[in-house]
């Protein structure tokens, strides 16, 4: 793709950097390029109803539209969690080797391959989900999560990092521009999980342990699904006119 853009004069490079990572060589190019994927910005075959995406630890993402229909649920790969046994063995083998020895270099390479596999699995899931959203949906609302702040919580730091919510948000942002997806970012203080998607009441007693949302109005719904529906309706709520005072 880069070669074709260079031949067509749609890309002008001005810098390049080379690095070695996980026993592979990587070349990063910097330049000025024309708009990509202009031919794919079509609304044909897309969901026309506004959609919302709730990102989390148990489920990486739940996508639902404003009408309450769940469009997709993606479970996290938990690559780091599943690799803990292999990582412990590789770290132990590395610690037993001598500094500067061939064995240490081989042990470091094995350890690097495990970390590379974890990162690749996480990145692959985020790429697939962001591509689906950018090419299937018309309008998507996601929360403006403070991922860096969330990783400061000792009880959730590893799970949040393993989920890759930051990578998913970044990919959604640039692929939305590529494929013509209209994306909105709801305020991080918007109570999407605590608000009932049926009656609009807010359950201030809801905790992270409550995976099912139960409302006195009779609604019983998965917490993530309820949040995704509320996010799908957020653009209308955020632009709604404030109530006028009653006439004296």
Stretch-by-stretch model annotation:
Residues 1-20:
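Acidic carboxylate diad motif detector
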